[in-house]
Amino acid sequence: MSGYPGYNNGGYGAPNQQYPPQPYYPPQPAYGAPPPQGGGYGYHQPPPPQQPYGYSQPPPQQYGGYNGVPPNAPQYGRPGMPSVNSNAYTNGNQNAPPPPPQGMHAFGQGAPQGYAFQYSNCTGKRKALLIGINYFGQRGQLRGCINDVKNMSSYLHENFGYQRDDMVLLTDDQQNPMSQPTKQNILRAMHWLVKDARPNDSLFFHYSGHGGQTKDLDGDEEDGYDEVIYPVDFRQVGHIVDDEMHRIMVQPLQPGVRLTAIFDSCHSGTALDLPYVYSTQGVLKEPNLAKEAGQGLLGVISSYSQGDMSGVASNLMGFFKKATTGDDAYNKTLATKTSPADVIMWSGSKDDQTSADATIAAQATGAMSWAFITAMKKNPQQSYVQLLNSIRDELATKYTQKPQLSCSHPLNTNLLFVM
């Protein structure tokens, strides 16, 4: 079904992938920068020249070909997956959160006039793309990212009906060149993930590796910086910017298609450029420039006291940039990055935070990946806001990072989280 090139001689689906035993490691540092120049995580660099990847870039388009009416789609009905009106979603638990409603819903919240979105009931076909990069032999090598992919793929298969043939795993311990998490392979796999997606399909994207920031060139970031991820070959071909990930994986989706994304990387709070970010109270966050400007000045003072003059310059630049362009950037994101599809993102840290490469139960793992699976296993019938708080509670026992929940549309965070 999957049709991902490079597997089974160009046939369908990804093979069952075997992982070598992972050694036990002591607690690891943050998913800090694999920087080609300079020190710590979150360094800023200009985007590298874009290179062709063997596929033509689609022209700019409306989201999912959206014209206000969702297309009719067959119900794939994978065996064992519940209908949205059945008690199977909640195992008969009358206290469980309500399942997602059907039909189209108006955006509001400053979105483009006339826009509507559709929740997915996640009863259609299922595809997953899982990326884990340990950066073997490189500065900033990590130890838990491949384990994250192994753990997440098993969890999806055993608990959510994702078939092995419908999952593509890109990790840098594999011999097949098509399975290496190079920039070209990652972009190709992103296109594969969303290709031919229909309403009520459930797509899953997971990235565990290095993340960072680079200067924003299109004015859609409140802090003046885009979020980026680092392929295994980033030193040769550069990083992948959040704008490009949004264009490939969010923009083509029709109303009612679910994409669940998890980023276990530094500075990943808005890594898909989804405009609706929610607090642990389930309340939509809007930029508080006075508060954020104050935090920026605190960063200046902190950097100065530590003798970090580059940090002083960076914090001052961010402070003035945010104070003058934050509202404009937020409004532009609402107007240009809103989508009628059902895109949910869980990220391991805020845009200004690092994410931990940890050792838990004697296994190297990413903290966010571990916390998501742990929280879901403890209670698989949680609302969005309950799950966000559960993930934070798991992380709070060991780490300072704070996970983020963002969405492509205004979200009723009291609904049951499904995928």
Swiss-Prot record:
Signal peptide: none annotated. Residues 83-95 have a biased composition (Polar residues). GO terms for molecular function: cysteine-type endopeptidase activity. Pfam families: Peptidase_C14. Residues 1-109 are annotated as: Disordered. The keyword Oxidoreductase does not apply. InterPro entries: Caspase-like_dom_sf, Metacaspase, Pept_C14_caspase. The keyword Mitochondrion does not apply. The active site is at H210, C266. Its EC number is 3.4.22.-. One of its GO terms (biological process) is proteolysis. Involved in cell death (apoptosis). Belongs to the peptidase C14B family. PANTHER family: METACASPASE-1, METACASPASE-4. This is Metacaspase-1. The gene is casA.
